[in-house]
């Protein structure tokens, strides 16, 4: 996947081509490729993938086809599921209040219950993180309006949170640099 980005390929078309076994890709097929890259990259499963296609583009596929597509992604990019598994170790370290390092050149530090320390000194935290042996899942307390709700967290979600946090740091830095010369009005995602 990194090579595709480096070569400035349209990774959505490349994924769709792998999924459908075709070189000429329609707009709808590219959307399937895009949804696969963006969702499966953070460990989206077949059920959610099927629902996402239906909700966002009125594309109806059966669960068997959704599973085939998700499995195709995981076979094409086996290092990504390996990354999710390594991120599960982050959850274990937080839950057990242990220090560990993560990422290329160990750029991210996990400081026990404090969470994942980002390069700018901010933290990604999962309040009251705990492991539920009955389900085999990690859960944490998430604020939803005025309520606190239990929310699942897993390796793929941790990777998504890290990617979003690092992107925010980069955009913030760029805004500071731009603001030295121009007035910043807003950002668009």
Language-model features, listed with the residues they occupy:
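Conserved catalytic core of nucleotide polymerization and phosphodiester-bond processing enzymes
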Residues: 1-189
């Amino acid at each position: 996947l990194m090579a595709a980005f480096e070569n400035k390929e349209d990774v959505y078309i490349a994924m769709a081509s792998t999924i459908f076994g075709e070189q000429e890709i329609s707009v709808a097929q590219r959307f399937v490729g895009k949804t696969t890259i963006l969702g499966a990259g953070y460990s989206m499963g077949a059920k959610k993938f099927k629902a996402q296609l239906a909700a966002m583009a009125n594309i109806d596929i059966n669960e068997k086809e959704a599973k085939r597509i998700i499995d195709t992604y995981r076979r094409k990019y086996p290092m990504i599921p390996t990354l999710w598994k390594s991120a599960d170790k982050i959850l274990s370290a937080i839950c057990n209040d242990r220090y560990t390092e993560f990422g290329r050149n160990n750029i991210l530090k996990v400081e026990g219950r404090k969470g994942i320390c980002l390069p700018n000194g901010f933290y990604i935290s999962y309040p009251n993180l705990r492991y539920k042996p009955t389900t085999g899942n990690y859960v944490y307390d998430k604020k939803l309006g005025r309520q606190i709700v239990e929310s699942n967290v897993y390796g793929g979600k941790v990777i998504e949170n890290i990617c979003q946090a690092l992107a925010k740091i980069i955009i913030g830095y760029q805004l500071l640099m731009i603001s030295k010369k121009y007035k910043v009005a807003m950002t668009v995602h």
